[in-house]
Amino acid sequence: MVGIFNIVIDEENFKVLDSSLHFEVEAGLMYPSVSVVSWMGLANVFEAGMNASILILPKDAFGNNISFSGKKMEFQEFSLSLISENGSFAGVLNSTHIRWIVSGYISIDFVLVTSGKFLLLVEKESQTLNGGPLPLEVNSGPLDVSNCVSIWKSELSTWQIFSKMEILLHQKDRFGNIVSGFYEFDADVVEVETGLSIPVADFQFEYVEPGIQLMSFTLSEPGNFLLTLSDMKHNKSISSMPYVYTVYIGYCDGSRSIVNGSGINASIAGESLGFSVYLKDAYGYPSPVQVDRLQVRIVLEIDSSIILPTIQPREALNGTGSSHQAATPLYEKHGGRASGNLVTQASIFDVTYTPKRTGIYRIFISSGNIVLNGGQPFIKEVYAGEVNVAACSVTQFNGKVPKEIKNEIVVLLLDGFYNPVPSQPSRLKFEITSANTSSFTTWEFVDNNDGTYTGSYLAMEVGTYRMCISFDNKHIQPCPFDVNVYSNGYFPRAYDDPVNVWEDESISFNPLENDYFAGDNASMLGFSQPGHGSLLRDGNLLRYTPMKNFSGNDSFLYTIADINGNLAAATVYIFVLTAPPQFVSFSGGLQATEDLISPRYGGFSGLEISYSDLLENISVMVQALSGSVILSPMLMQFRPPGSGKLSVSNGGEDRRVLILEGQVGVINPALQSIQYLGNENFAGVDSLRLSTKNKNGINHLDVPVFVEPVNDPPFINVPQYIMLESNGSESLIFHPERDKFNFSVGDPDLVNFPGGESHFLVTFSLEVTDGFLLTNLPSELINSTELKFKNLFQWQPIQTYAAISKHVNVKASGIRFRGTIRQCNDLMQQLLHRGGENGAVLTLKLSDMGNYGCFLDCTERISLPLHAEARVNLIRKRPLSSLGAHGTFMKYLVVVPFSFFSIKLFSLLMVLIG
């Protein structure tokens, strides 16, 4: 990574903290296979003759961008070449302009002149740039008539009368590219002797292939003619016009003519061969022609090389025999006759030739434009001759080999014309000329079917062995040659190395660590370039950095040499592990509302993962620490076929972990549908734990969830009635030992109140309809305490009081104060009631004073106060007589649920009965 970095020095014991040191890291040298090549403007379709431009983003071995601002750079080391669709080499491109542009790219301009679909290969230092090869399509330019080419089906300019002349007209632009489309051309035939234009009735132009027309017409008159194809409107003729041709009177029939002789059969290289040609008409009669109109072309299939034959016409004698012409004409290449005034006619020809190279030959024979053998060539094969030992050689052997290891020797057998000779393994033999032969084992030679033979041997003992290879007891050079056999420990052994590295990371390793070499001293001679990363060397240490976003397998070869110059090679197999999916987009915090599913519609936006392998199944686990995570119904989505299915489940001990499984293409939409519901009455900051997992590991991300509080009403837990002493004395109202009930007040917002319990204030009031309430209040509550007395309906603050041990005794029919929940509950635990012998009703009221939970800012989180109210029937027990106990008990059971008037009525009845 490049940039300016600070060094922070922190020492806790001596309280040292210094961050004043910094350093700068600059990009290294350009590494071709990491640098990125692309088309300028993303355009890759051009017309021939247009200027094309590519952009190169130079990077170092670690993927850092290189800036050449103010620095010199060698631009000429880039090579541009075209590869055709079938993978063959199509040519080298010459750059016309190379420059450095401000955006950080190198721009290379070049001109494209060859049409077709190609791959552009951009290389530097024999390394292909990343992103290449680039697809490229070049369309042909406009038609250039003067550059069009005509190709005759017959290579001779002589045509037999009544033949159909056929010419393939190739439409081309100015660069020689085929131009598609049907274009009109003008044809004109002129007789040479008269200079007059000859009318042709059946001129035909047929579009046979893209950019190729077939022009044809019938030759109905003998003589010498000129043919011109042109565009008369623009006064332009196609190239090589006019075409001079001769029409002669002849009746040769290619299918009835005969070719026979050993020269068209298989033969041995160097043999003189021959065959005879008998020209016949359609009725089988001899059809003589001028001898210069017979053409024989012998082509070697492998490289299209030509053999020049000798053609001799044979003269018929009174129909009973034949004799050869005295003069033997000379021929040009392709079997064409040299210029001369030969006018001899013949129908029988003898052809001789000598093939010296082995392979498949094609023999084309034609009389003028009439091709024999039905228009097809004769096929023959030439085999190698007898082995010429003087031309043979031992081409491969190793002068230093380990003992007890099978080693190989390669021998090349050639004939007298240096053709490889196959199928002769049994005639090859090993000959050991040294004295030590008892511990030496040989195997038969194996034919490699290309003239080479592989022989194997094994030496059990250390020493020098002198040997020869013989063919039919004749020694093949070099002979003898020495092979030195050493113990196995003499030679180095390189072992393959497996290396694991995370994608987008780098790893340094020494491939020689597990290799063996004598003397504990070896050096690395070199290494090949990996296909998907960079490789830097520091001594015997290599540092591999995969290309950005690449994961999978990579490899390279390396070669070592020991102190004796012995070599060994091995392969480093690199496994670039796909890192667990990373979150490329996530919110700094999610917003939610207490006790509500958030968001209300859809899910949280901004949660997205990236993963380099689009087809691998991965999983994402989502869990809230103080809540639950659910998946909202997702909208209908159209995904490409093969994108996989989404699996949704719950896991964990409490089944509160939402698990999404599938390919990254289906998980990302699901992440956009996640909803949150906090625990009951929870408000504050929660954490959403997102865990992404693949086959190589797991990655965690904690996203805060800010749960906005909602003001919950306070609550009062009291029973409907409480039984007190009947004599009207002081009685503890809420007695936990007497009444098994949780007497308490509270507020759900208190649990998550950030200011703590001491700052969560409420207003608590208690009023009794008869008698007095007595309690002992802490002195800090005096300022907020108000009292209500009998027959007074207003709350009054405490005017005078006497504090004992920071507490004040209070006696009134009503008490109201502002305090904490704990202080309210403490008051309830010590609240006394006096008087009211006939019972009373205690009313409890609790107000949260609008506390909204105060999250995050109490000044902005205040709402209208919420209240809780409860009434408790305080019943004074009276001793019952044995006579009225049963009835009294029943009345007691009936009146308990009623209100204050019911209690008064109950008391009156008790007095009357008593």
UniProtKB/Swiss-Prot annotation:
The chain crosses the membrane at residues 893-913. One of its GO terms (molecular function) is actin filament binding. Its main location: membrane. It is found in: Cell membrane. One of its GO terms (biological process) is actin cytoskeleton organization. Keywords: Cell membrane, Membrane, Repeat, Transmembrane, Transmembrane helix. It is a single-pass membrane protein. The keyword Glycoprotein does not apply. Filamin repeats lie at residues 249-382, 391-485. GO terms for cellular component: plasma membrane. Disulfide bonds: none annotated. In tricellular pollen, expressed in mature sperm cells but not in the vegetative cell. In bicellular pollen, detected in the progenitor generative cell. Detected in the egg cell within the female gametophyte. The keyword Glycosyltransferase does not apply. This is Protein GAMETE EXPRESSED 2. The lineage of its organism: Eukaryota, Viridiplantae, Streptophyta, Embryophyta, Tracheophyta. The gene is GEX2.
